[in-house]
Amino acid sequence: MKLVFASNNKNKIAEIQSMLPESITILSLEDINCFEDIPETADTIEGNAILKADYVTQKYGYDCFADDTGLEVDAINGEPGVYSARYAGEQKNADDNMNKLLKALENNKNRSAQFKTVITLNLEGKQYIFTGIAKGEITETKTGTNGFGYDPIFKPENFDKTFAELPLEIKNTIGHRGKAVQQLIDLLTATK
């Protein structure tokens, strides 16, 4: 089965493809000649995932799935949330985003946070929504070189390492995206 993933983020595509059974092949937006930026104008993570999946299905006619992820930090009222990718500005720079977040939490003892991924799947005229959450805390410094985004400053519950220090296989099992993707896989393998 071939399925379009409404993303050109090569890190995300590789991470998700590594979790899928060999029978499911991901096509990127580039693979279907979609080079425009898909609007992410919703004010929720769920809303953005739906917007992206619907855009590809309606404009290009493909069954597809899309995701949106946000980091929600308790001490700053759930920020950066839906604005996680552009928290420090439209340039979407991960280091700038992490630095801004670390500055916002400076001298704050409450560092509780959660990553939330929502995947919307448009398949054969039906829409499915899957949510994965990984609870943890924001560290005081960046540690590790694996992963991307906020991974160097997010330490998942019951671990003494950040996502950026953990092997991809472990992150995929305990992480927000991995949990949502597993729900996607369960549905796709059940409907074959």
UniProtKB/Swiss-Prot annotation:
Binds 1 Mg(2+) ion per subunit. Substrate binds at residues 7-12, 69, 148-151, 171, 176-177. Mg(2+) binds at residue 68. Its cofactor is Mg(2+). One of its GO terms (biological process) is purine nucleoside triphosphate catabolic process. Its EC number is 3.6.1.66. The keyword Hydrolase applies. One of its GO terms (cellular component) is cytosol. One of its GO terms (molecular function) is ribonucleoside triphosphate phosphatase activity. CDD domains: HAM1. InterPro entries: dITP/XTP_pyrophosphatase, ITPase-like_fam, RdgB/HAM1. It holds the Pfam family Ham1p_like. Belongs to the HAM1 NTPase family. Homodimer. Pyrophosphatase that catalyzes the hydrolysis of nucleoside triphosphates to their monophosphate derivatives, with a high preference for the non-canonical purine nucleotides XTP (xanthosine triphosphate), dITP (deoxyinosine triphosphate) and ITP. Seems to function as a house-cleaning enzyme that removes non-canonical purine nucleotides from the nucleotide pool, thus preventing their incorporation into DNA/RNA and avoiding chromosomal lesions. PANTHER family: INOSINE TRIPHOSPHATE PYROPHOSPHATASE, INOSINE TRIPHOSPHATE PYROPHOSPHATASE/HAM1 PROTEIN. This is dITP/XTP pyrophosphatase.
